[in-house]
A protein has these predicted regions:
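N-terminal periplasmic/intermembrane-space "pro-region" immediately following the signal or transit peptide
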Residues: 3, 7-79, 118, 295-300, ...
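Extracellular/periplasmic loop regions
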Residues: 12-34, 237-238, 264-268, 275-383
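Outer-membrane beta-barrel "beta-signal"
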Residues: 15-28, 353, 395, 399, ...
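Transmembrane beta-strands of outer-membrane beta-barrel proteins
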Residues: 54-64, 101-105, 141-145, 182-186, ...
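Surface-exposed loop and membrane-interface regions of Gram-negative outer-membrane beta-barrel proteins
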Residues: 65-84, 94-138, 149-157, 194, ...
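Flexible, surface-exposed loop regions and adjacent strand-edge segments
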Residues: 72-76, 117-122, 158-162, 198-202, ...
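Signature for the C-terminal beta-barrel architecture of outer-membrane proteins
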Residues: 136-140, 153-310, 348, 368, ...
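Predominantly the C-terminal beta-signal and adjacent terminal strand-loop region
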Residues: 402-434, 438
């Protein structure tokens, strides 16, 4: 299929586990001569007539503990939860012309004292299920599917939550000569807790096009895109109304001589009820690899807020369906009416071990607008007043013990600034550990 190219060797296959499991191609292991590990014969089976069936899955166990989530504005006190997620999938292909991908999921959680969000629990259900038809570099996909676009600032799978984000709909993808172009019309999956009862959220829709250039002679690559969003019920500090939003964006990213960069700009127009939308964001992630194991980084973001509520124009940026958590594992803030500066350092003392530390300084972009909690919830008591939201300091470790086994941990300490203290905000902590096994 045009959406995934077969790796050159079985060993490369084993290093090629991907966040989007449909991006993997294990057909090399259908050749008995390339099977070198005990379960290789199970991983890929020749089903005759030029067709193959590959199997895979992931088991993740994650523990979280939090004190005063979202600066104590969501709840006060301490809470903890154990999250269990099991994913299994089958990938049947008839060469590169026809493909059927099916992924089932079981997501469970212990009971939180503050109440479990909808993204915690779902009995066995269809996580993904789609049909691909491929001709040359063009692939047409229809069905339920996960999606990551570019940096994930606007559309991503939301892997931190127990239930990853998926969409129902169609996508056309073209890959040729280093170009990647996608056109899509999708609606988010509506999560329901019982078995096989997840439907389509018809109150929302996402459509548009996304293109990525080939590498450009030492200056990186460029994404450019248009994304449309409809929400029958959009909620902002300015009120609740039908939202029709158009996002026009560009992203420049790459690395050279120890320097890496990822810079993205988006402008938004549309309608929010009777009001017109005029919003924007500018985001950057810059890094300098001082020595082989050490990277110094700086993230800086501005997501516009609403300067004058009631003036007939909504200025609050909407990040659509972004990666969450967005800044740290504590999932403290949504990228709306926000200015953020996050210096950090990353150390890789061993090839598969990454240690990181950062501090994130947060301000409201517009005083008159609210502070927005994830995913995009305005906290009414934070309208007006000061800009200083507060800070969060993060320590994290990511150890890929083997290509199949990954251990992760994070600690975040956060404290409110004047704008949040005035609304009753408090300091808090977040701790997370997880183990994930892919197969």
């Amino acid at each position: 299929m045009a959406l995934a190219a077969a790796p050159a060797s079985a060993e490369n296959d084993r290093r090629g586990y991907a966040s989007l499991r449909y991006d993997e191609d294990w057909r090399a292991l259908c050749d008995p001569a390339r099977r070198t590990q005990p379960f290789d014969a199970v991983k890929c089976r020749d089903t005759g007539g030029g067709t193959t069936l590959t199997l895979g899955g992931e088991l993740r166990e994650r523990f979280e503990a939090v004190r005063n989530p979202v600066f104590g504005l969501a709840a006060r006190g301490s809470d903890r939860v154990l999250l269990h997620r099991l994913l299994v999938h089958a990938d049947w292909r008839a060469g590169d012309a026809v493909r059927v991908f099916v992924q089932l999921a079981d997501r469970r959680a212990t009971t939180r004292g503050f109440g479990n969000p909808p993204t915690d629990r779902d009995a066995v259900d269809l996580a993904q299920g789609f049909l691909d038809l491929g001709v040359g570099g063009l692939t047409l996909r229809a069905g339920r599917q996960e999606l990551d676009l570019g940096s994930g600032r606007l559309v991503a799978v939301r892997d931190g939550a127990n239930i990853r984000r998926a969409f129902d709909g169609g996508r056309a993808s073209w890959r040729r000569h280093g170009w990647r172009i996608d056109a899509l019309f999708l609606q988010p999956v509506a999560i329901a807790p019982a078995a096989f009862d997840d439907g389509t959220d018809t109150s929302q829709a996402l459509w548009g096009g996304y293109a990525t250039t080939p590498p450009l002679a030492g200056v990186g690559q460029i994404d450019f895109y248009y994304l449309g969003l409809r929400r029958n019920r959009g909620v902002f500090a300015a009120g609740t109304a039908r939202e029709l939003r158009h996002s026009f964006g560009a992203r420049w990213f790459g690395k050279r001589d120890g320097v890496d960069w990822d810079i993205e700009a988006v402008v938004q127009a549309g309608r929010f009820g009777a009001d017109r939308i005029a919003a924007w964001t500018l985001a950057s992630n810059l890094g300098w690899r001082v020595a082989a194991p050490l990277r110094l980084g700086l993230k800086a973001d501005i997501a516009s807020g609403d300067a004058r509520p009631g003036d007939g124009r909504l200025g609050t940026f909407n990040a659509l369906y972004p990666k969450l958590p967005y800044f740290t594992e504590a999932n403290l803030v949504a990228p709306a009416n926000l200015m953020d500066l996050q210096p950090g350092v990353t150390v890789t003392p061993a090839p598969r071990l990454e240690l990181a530390a950062s501090i994130d300084l947060l301000w409201k972009h517009r005083r008159a607008d609210a502070f927005y909690a994830p995913p995009l919830t305005p906290i009414a008591a934070t309208r007006g007043g000061g800009r200083w939201i507060g800070w969060q300091a993060s320590l994290s470790a990511n150890w890929r013990v083997t290509p199949r086994l990954t251990l992760r941990g994070a600690y975040v300490r956060f404290a409110p600034g004047a704008a949040i203290r005035a609304a009753g905000g408090r300091a808090g902590d977040f701790v997370m550990t997880s183990v994930a096994i892919k197969f």
